[in-house]
């Protein structure tokens, strides 16, 4: 029993075909807007009529819908096939050693890898300009994870229990892409890359990234009532600037199991009562590779010749995004039937990793930088009730509610606010992220039919100006969210239903742009508001 080892490997192969224009027929919901204007029967065949125009049946399949301006997806699949295949492997191995009592040494290795191929053809007889094209693209990806830990459990007496763990983990990821296109092919029977009279510049890209971590934890419990957990880790990522690749994080947590105290032993209706508090820091490295480096890229043409040009600005100060979190909670169960869990939290996020806008005179639109700080405060409450419990039957209900108050606390370059172009959003210190920033519409003037708006000072105007945009008091992210559910059980058979909800979230109704717009009256049904 002192040595254990294992291996698990999964291998899969997937092959499928798609059209190049997979959404040529557009969204399935569009038929609700255009059914009466286009073809109510939704057929894809020619409609046959007699001399008086009466329907007599269906003829051959239509390859192009004149009234809609779309090609038949079946037709596209025949003339522009897209063949894709993926080979994927997931595997892991481990070795577990127990040299002495309480000591567990474990090493594990895992791999996630795939090889993807896409073969696209556009036969010369196709109706599209530039037909007679073949392209091949490949992608190879693999990620290796190496984890090594040593855990030691011991006690100083029956009341003092310790668990000490030290570990190291490395994640190595590599990705490579290649694609090439050949044009001006004349025979659909010879759609090989070498058969084209003209070739595009091949595209070849690759990236490597490495994540290393050293960590340790100490867990202590006293008298099976008081618990303390300490954790520390040092993380390093190749995604950041050379002098900022490493960062330290830590956490501290404590829990008091009050139900086991002597002064509560005789409280029969109280099943459990626990108080807990924790504080810790974590890091985020969720950016793409090489943003910290000033790079040049290829795939560009100048005067018909291949060339290179700057592709990323680089940032010598790019570092980890960090989050500090405080949690305070209480949980209890009473009468062996009712359970309640309440938790308050405060999360402060600093050095947020975001795209920082640059003047186009620099030759770049943006650069990834540590640009802002944000705070989230709120609470979570979970309730549960066992309505009925018998030997064969059980019925329970549960629900949860979350409230989160979000606030931007800092922006880049000392700015107090920044408008995100073409998004209807504005970042402002003291405001939540995601509050809409628009010019308020005041309706249509019935005297002349013109739109009216509110300017920044709340006055009516018929002159629309982006300068009159204001915060409208509505958010794209819900401050309230939750859910509820119920579960029935009978002799080992269970049935459950779960529901979720959000309150205070607003979304743009883009459908109204088409269904309440005279410009689209010829192609989309209009709502009664347009009468």
Q: For each predicted feature, which ranges?
A:
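Conserved C-terminal beta-signal and adjacent last beta-strands/turns
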Residues: 396, 475-503
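Transmembrane beta-strand segments that form the barrel wall of outer-membrane beta-barrel proteins
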Residues: 228-237, 386
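Surface-exposed loop/interface segments of Gram-negative outer-membrane beta-barrel transport/assembly proteins
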Residues: 2-88, 106-212, 239-241, 258-325, ...
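Short glycine/threonine-rich loop-to-helix capping motif typified by GTGT followed
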Residues: 242-246
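Transmembrane beta-barrel architecture of outer membranes
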Residues: 213, 247-251
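Short, contiguous hydrophobic alpha-helices characteristic of membrane insertion segments
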Residues: 216-232
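Residues on the lipid-exposed face of transmembrane beta-strands in outer-membrane beta-barrel proteins
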Residues: 1, 91-97, 148-152, 166, ...
